[in-house]
C-alpha cells in the first residue's frame, strides 16, 4: 500500500489570471499574543495572505487572533497539533487525538471552517501521522524553505536564506510563536522580533521577483487544481 503523500512544494499554475508563479508563506507555533498581531499587521500592510499552523492548546486564550485571521478574509488556519509533541514518540491513538482535538479547537474558534491541513511538530513525520491526515481528508504539509528563524540567526540571515532558496511553488516555514514547553517568562515581546523584521523585507522582495503569495486553503479543491509533490 502506498503511503499518503507529504506536501513539500506545490506544482502547477493557479488559474487566477496573473500568470505569475505561486509561493506560500506559513507560520508555525502560534497564535502568540504579541508576535502574531505584528505579523498580521505586516501581512495586511502588503495585502498578503498566509497559512498559520496553530497549536490547539493556545486557542482558548487567543481565539480573538483566530477570529482576526478569518475576518481579514484571506488567511488560513491550519493544524500544528494540540500540544506540539514529537509525534514519532506517540502511540497511534495519541497521534489521532493530537490532530482531531486541534481540528475541533480550530472549529470552535472559527465556526464553519473545515478540517485543517496538519503539519507535524519539528517536521517529524511517521506513517501514522500521514494516515491520520489522510483519514481527515487533508494534506500533510511540510515545507521546502526553512531559514531556521526560531534559532534567531539575525533578520538579515533570515531574509537572505529565504530569498536564496525560494522558487515557484515553494512553501516557506516561519514562526509566529513557540511550543508551550519552550515559553520563557519575560521574553514574550522579543520572541519573534527577527522574524517580524525579516518579513517586512521578504514580502517586497518576493513581489519584485515577481511571485504571487497564496494560502494552501484550496489544495485538492476543484476550484484550484494543482499537482502535489
UniProtKB/Swiss-Prot annotation:
What family does the Swiss-Prot or TrEMBL record give for this protein? Answer: Belongs to the polysaccharide deacetylase family.
Q: Which organism is it from?
A: Rhizobium leguminosarum bv. phaseoli
Q: What are the recorded Gene Ontology BP terms?
A: carbohydrate metabolic process
Q: Which Gene3D superfamilies match?
A: Glycoside hydrolase/deacetylase
**Which residues are recorded as binding a divalent metal cation?**
80, 84
Q: InterPro entries in the record, alphabetically?
A: Glyco_hydro/deAcase_b/a-brl, NODB_dom, Nodulat_NodB, Polysacc_deacetylase_ArnD
**PROSITE patterns documented for this protein:** NODB
| UniProt-recorded Gene Ontology molecular function terms | hydrolase activity, acting on carbon-nitrogen (but not peptide) bonds; metal ion binding
Q: Cite the NCBIfam families for this sequence.
A: nodulat_NodB (TIGR04243)
Where is the site labelled Raises pKa of active site His? 149
Q: What is this protein called?
A: Chitooligosaccharide deacetylase
Q: Where in the cell is it found?
A: Cytoplasm
The UniProt keyword set, sorted, is:
Cytoplasm, Hydrolase, Metal-binding, Nodulation, Plasmid
State its Enzyme Commission number(s): 3.5.1.-
Top EC class per UniProt?
A: hydrolase
Gene this protein is translated from: nodB
Report one GO cellular component. Answer: membrane
